[in-house]
Amino acid sequence: MSEAEARPTNFIRQIIDEDLASGKHTTVHTRFPPEPNGYLHIGHAKSICLNFGIAQDYQGQCNLRFDDTNPVKEDIEYVDSIKNDVEWLGFHWSGDIRYSSDYFDQLHAYAVELINKGLAYVDELTPEQIREYRGTLTAPGKNSPFRDRSVEENLALFEKMRTGGFEEGKACLRAKIDMASPFIVMRDPVLYRIKFAEHHQTGTKWCIYPMYDFTHCISDALEGITHSLCTLEFQDNRRLYDWVLDNITIPVHPRQYEFSRLNLEYTVMSKRKLNLLVTDNHVEGWDDPRMPTISGLRRRGYTAASIREFCKRIGVTKQDNTIEMASLESCIREDLNENAPRAMAVIDPVKLVIENYPQGESEMVTMPNHPNKLEMGSREVPFSGEIWIDRADFREEANKQYKRLVMGKEVRLRNAYVIKAERVEKDAEGNITTIFCTYDADTLSKDPADGRKVKGVIHWVSAAHALPIEIRLYDRLFSVPNPGAAEDFLSVINTESLVIKQGYGEPSLKAAVAGKAFQFEREGYFCLDSRYATADKLVFNRTVGLRDTWAKAGE
């Protein structure tokens, strides 16, 4: 990592400091355990930065472990994308990649140990009956009629489950804890269920698969994890985490600590809702630049450094809160303002003809790649008597606040000449098709000799040298800050979240590559699209505007 700022402080790091100072632990070992059933999103980035960042700062280790206990929903596609996302964010896992499926034999043995201790039983209630028997937050559950089977019978039935003797949903293994517990998670939770599905790592070896709560704690213990960090929705599950480890023969007992998950305005984080956006074609895929997925943010032009900075700024607490989208946008805007080279592109073009410029001629003007960083060098940009400017940069009449080109008045072309609007041509509908101007030949990158003041500056692209470009103006996917609270979250999709324009860019953009952003001067930050751009068709995505227009609109 390139950031050299001071180490962040939060309650988890305070716990680690105390554990190291007291000698409870001599090293720090964390893990990031995603389920490979979807693409990682910005909320996962917070967990990645926390777990890998802690390991890095304490010279410890962080494992990447795939919680692959549900073969029906998982796929190697997701495994590969998760590995790519973690590496792209700038982190490296310790040793080999782990899979929960690596421990299936040990997990099975621990399940047998619980049966032998009278702490687990095979239940033949249907899934619906199990839910009914579980009770509610205000009413205790009731015991299954199969709860008091003998150890021998449970061992035989569990082996029958393992060898495929039951159909799916006809039997499961449950922990024998307390059906009257005030914590529903402790009311005889399911430890194993039957699934006849091929697993991406183990093939068809198993037809019984352990549940998350049984797998997670044992995997942590087998890997020697010292601090198991989860989001707050797993707070009650900590009781089951500890119960399992307290009741099996295992030398290590990690501790689980919970922190608040990331909630971000104008988007959803639910994997189910994100999947619905993809499968119902509201977006183009998991890497759609409007999605909060890491792959979507990357394609939109977000940098790994900006996401790490965002995660650092929001911090780690136990308080649930919702972060303004402007906070994320501010991080990428600051990053690109500092590091992105400048270029000129016209998004809504209108032709401008300089009538007194030598006909058919052109020249090169020198432009800095960054106004404040001379080390980024400069480039030569062609200029000619016919250029494209943005339609919004010209008005036939305007008040004094309008600092662009107005009929009969002057404006400066960026790093070029002062021009004056003389007349226009319009089509049959009254739309301006061409603006005719004159230029002051003695004003190339300098003020007029007679001392007259020209306040406005607009950007431009030489028509004879322009590259046709497609510009995808991405915006927030939803029109309200909390779409998840809507009765139908799909009903509040922002219909203007993608606007496609055909414009022109300066010739230097021919060398653009995906993942490297530009500031299109006076327009915003853009990057070449990794999916649609080709050598013959340049497609640029808007990463973020030059300023927060949503805040202005809400005032």
Curated annotation (Swiss-Prot):
- Listed GO biological process terms: glutaminyl-tRNA aminoacylation; glutamyl-tRNA aminoacylation
Q: Which Gene3D superfamilies match?
A: Glutamyl-trna Synthetase, Domain 2, Glutamyl-tRNA Synthetase, Domain 3, HUPs, Ribosomal Protein L25, Chain P
Q: Which GO terms describe its cellular component?
A: cytosol
Residues annotated as binding ATP are 35-37, 41-47, 231, 261-262, 269-271
Indicate where this protein is primarily found.
cytoplasm
Q: Where does L-glutamine bind?
A: D67, Y212
Q: What is its EC number?
A: 6.1.1.18
* Span list, region Interaction with tRNA: 317-324
Q: Its catalytic activity?
A: tRNA(Gln) + L-glutamine + ATP = L-glutaminyl-tRNA(Gln) + AMP + diphosphate
Assigned keywords, A-Z: Aminoacyl-tRNA synthetase, ATP-binding, Cytoplasm, Ligase, Nucleotide-binding, Protein biosynthesis
Q: Where is this motif: 'KMSKS' region?
A: 268-272
Q: Where is this motif: 'HIGH' region?
A: 34-44
- On whether NAD is a keyword of this UniProt record, the answer is no
Extract the NCBIfam families matched here: glnS (TIGR00440), PRK14703.1 (NF011291)
Q: Which PANTHER family match?
A: GLUTAMATE--TRNA LIGASE, GLUTAMINE-TRNA LIGASE
Summarize the subunit comment.
Answer: Monomer.
Q: Which family does it belong to?
A: Belongs to the class-I aminoacyl-tRNA synthetase family.
Task: Quote the HAMAP family the UniProt record gives.
Answer: Gln_tRNA_synth (MF_00126)
Protein's name in the database: Glutamine--tRNA ligase
Gene coding for it: glnS
